[in-house]
UniProtKB/Swiss-Prot annotation:
InterPro entries: Glyco_transf_92 (IPR008166), GTase_92 (IPR052012). It is an enzyme of class 2 (transferase). Belongs to the glycosyltransferase 92 family. It holds the Pfam family Glyco_transf_92. It comes from Caenorhabditis elegans. This is Glycosyltransferase family 92 protein C33H5.2.
Length: 507
């Protein structure tokens, strides 16, 4: 059995640590200007806003008809050198074939702390029907912005996977994507960079309908000095909050539920045969919920680096509970929230409540060991991994393991995928660099109580020393330098694409 420690660690998640230990005093919600101190800095910093998402909804149950939803990264937090301008509303201009309108709307801060200078915000406004042109209005100019419709393909459940960078854990990917397919989930994976052969496998799974690979370009203000807007060192976790909110907005009208996970957070239904049935059972008889939270239990896995020998059956059989609970992740009804932070929406609105799930947990693949002598089972033997508690319960049935393994074999026998599998990485290099960096820059400080040493969290402090034999696909896009407008200059990325000419890095 997999026994729990009597004393649970309250918070193993670095991200949640920021909320409760250091920044609990910042509640989130509508941004109010906090800095109008005449004794402080005298120079006002120009605001720069990067638009990550702009969706237009002809109809929406929660946003209203002809609604625009925006997700932006803005340098809102005051620095020692600059004042923050007085800025409370966004002004939007819209045109259709016959008329035009100008609308002012408040915005809402999503990130509930001020450790990073660049904040993620959300705004929405109802515009005109059949809109043809949308512009952001500044005092001294207009900025045309692109916009797109949300997804119209009906889905029960979408798994929103946080942005990956220098990713090489292909075994983890196969484990997750086949599990999600089995239980009725569609994976939307945000991607910054990954090993080129791993990327090619992802794209084949995208063609087969398992998932969507969504490029996640960096926040960029071309020509803007770093003391005005530091897009390298002052954005929390590779703009993960913006990515997760993008996923919520993208599937707002088409999915019944959205689960927000990292790739190594794998949710396996336990109280019902599918995700949608489990979620419906959880909410049954409860007051309306903004979200429900699954806690994470850490597991260790042992996998082969040789793709020709890799088996999901063997990977399941190798799982060992490590008696450590980490901060969970949320499942959201997209009609009940417009934005979300790393783990959950930062505020509850309209009398909605939250619920912590007790009937199931996320299987967190905290450690994935690449070993030549992995745990192997005979052709007819299936080992069911143990559930975390003191019972004899298991995470998954042998029948479901067999179904998932059969699905893997079906995919790998496709000629193109079979060829790509043979080229998957056999060494782990960047994963170890990132783990070492995060321990040195964040976790070691946290566990030793040296909280003052912790800065804006993210991979920007890691040294990605390039490996001569490893090539990565990395996202790029067109970014345009713009004339400064007051109080805000608006930017966005155009035409994102992946290239193998930019090295293996995060943003």
């Amino acid at each position: 059995m997999c026994r729990r420690n009597v004393i649970l660690v309250f918070c193993a998640s670095f991200a949640l640590f920021f909320t409760f230990i250091i920044f609990g005093r910042y509640p989130g919600g509508r941004f109010a200007v906090l800095y109008e101190n005449a004794t402080g800095p005298s120079e006002t910093r120009p605001l720069k806003a990067f638009i990550s998402s702009s969706y237009f909804y002809p109809t929406s149950k929660s946003l209203g008809d002809n609604a625009l939803a925006l997700v932006m990264s803005v340098n809102l937090v005051q620095t020692p050198s600059f004042l923050t301008p007085y800025f409370q509303e966004i002004v939007i201009s819209a045109e259709n074939a016959t008329s035009s309108a100008v609308v002012s709307t408040p915005f809402f801060r999503i990130i509930p702390h001020e450790q990073c200078q660049i904040m993620t915000i959300f705004a929405t406004a109802q515009l005109l029907p059949n809109v043809k042109r949308i512009q952001m209005v500044s005092h001294d100019g207009l900025t045309d912005i692109p916009f797109s419709p949300p997804s119209a393909i009906k889905r029960d459940v979408v798994m929103c996977i946080a942005p990956l960078f220098v990713s090489e854990q292909w075994q983890n990917f196969l484990f997750a994507v086949h599990i999600y397919k089995k239980y009725g989930g569609f994976m939307n994976l945000y991607l910054i960079s990954t090993i080129n052969t791993f990327f090619a496998v992802m794209k084949e799974y995208e063609k087969e309908g398992y998932m969507k690979v969504q490029p996640w370009p960096k926040v960029n203000f071309p020509g803007v000095p770093m003391d005005i807007a530091d897009t390298h060192g002052q954005i929390e976790f590779r703009s993960q909050t913006a990515a997760q909110t993008d996923c919520l907005l993208q599937y707002k009208e088409s999915a019944q539920y959205l689960a927000f996970l990292d790739l190594d957070d794998v949710l396996i239904p336990r109280i019902a045969p599918t995700y949608i049935e489990e979620f419906q059972r959880i909410i049954k008889g409860k007051k309306p919920l903004a979200y429900f939270l699954y806690h994470k239990e850490n597991y260790e896995a042992f996998v082969t680096p040789n793709s020709s020998q890799f088996s999901l059956k063997n990977m399941f059989g190798s799982l060992k509970c490590r008696n450590f609970r980490e901060t969970g992740k949320s499942v959201i009804d997209p009609q009940n929230a417009n934005y979300t932070w790393l783990h959950y929406p930062p505020v509850l609105v309209n009398g909605l409540e939250k619920y912590e799930v007790e009937e199931n947990v996320i299987t967190h693949l905290k450690t994935i060991n690449w070993v030549e002598d992995e745990v192997k089972t005979g052709n007819g033997t299936i080992i069911e991994p143990m559930y975390y508690d003191n019972s004899s319960a298991t995470i998954i049935s042998s029948k479901d393991i067999k179904d998932i393994e059969d699905d893997l074999q079906r995919m790998r026998n496709k000629p193109e995928i079979k060829k790509l599998f043979a080229e998957l990485p056999k060494i782990r290099y960047y994963s170890d660099l990132v783990l070492k960096c995060y321990n040195e820059k964040f976790y070691d400080y946290f566990y030793s109580g040296r909280y003052e040493k912790i800065t804006c969290p993210g991979p920007q402090y890691c040294d990605f020393k390039q490996h001569p034999d490893i090539t990565c696909m990395r996202v790029n896009a067109t970014h345009i330098e713009r004339e400064t407008l007051s109080p805000v200059t608006y930017y966005y990325a155009k035409d994102p694409y992946f290239t193998d000419k930019m090295g293996c890095y995060a943003h």
